[in-house]
């Protein structure tokens, strides 16, 4: 189980992508929320580590294209296993996944 947020940008990188027209380009919508997204990813990853054996408690950073267009705190969650021959065991993770995400979002709402 992996939770992803976008990588942190440096000040020169932010200046290079700042819109000049005052309009927000869709591919840059997430940049104002990177810190909040990272915190949300941390909370969700901790919940996943508590529920699923072998899951790290540290979230990952990756340039996930779909996250760049979200103008709010956002993460991507990857559910997969290379050692599971039968997908039904992954399907059984659903309730634990949903509960963990719900608890993390509830905790995040108190700090957002």
Protein language model annotation of sequence segments:
Residues 1-112:
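Active-site-proximal helix/loop segments of hydrolytic enzymes
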